[in-house]
C-alpha cells in the first residue's frame, strides 16, 4: 500500500510517499482502504512533534480524518462487512450532536 509518512525527521516538509506491506487485521479488527483524507491543523501540529511525548515516535503517519471502504476483516469482526463505506472517528464516544463531558476521554488513536 502507498502511504504518506514521516520517516526520520519531524516536520511536514519531511512527509514522504512510501510503499508499505498491506496491513493484516487482528481479531475483531478491520482494514480500511482509505479513499479520501484531510490534512487538518492537528496533523500539522503532530508532524512538528507539537504534542511532545504524546506525538509518538517515527516513523508515523500524521492523519486523523479520512474515509474509505472495508477491504479486509479479522476473525470476530462482525459490525462491518467487506465493501462497507466507513469514516473512522477520532473520538469513539462522540458520535453525534454537541460534545459534552460524557465524551471526555474518548480520543482514540492518534499517530498511525
Question: Where are the predicted features?
Answer:
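Short structural boundary motif marking the start of a folded domain
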Residues: 1-4
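Cofactor-binding loop segments of dinucleotide-utilizing enzymes, especially the Rossmann-like FAD-
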Residues: 8
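Short N-terminal binding/cap micro-motifs at the start of the first secondary-structure element
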Residues: 11-15, 41-43
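Short beta-strand-initiation
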Residues: 15-17, 111
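Short, acidic/hydrophobic/Gly-rich beta-strand patch recurrent on exposed beta strands
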Residues: 18, 45-48
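Glycine-rich beta-strand-centered segment in the early N-terminal region that forms part
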Residues: 21-37, 50-101, 109-110
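General nucleic-acid-binding
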Residues: 106
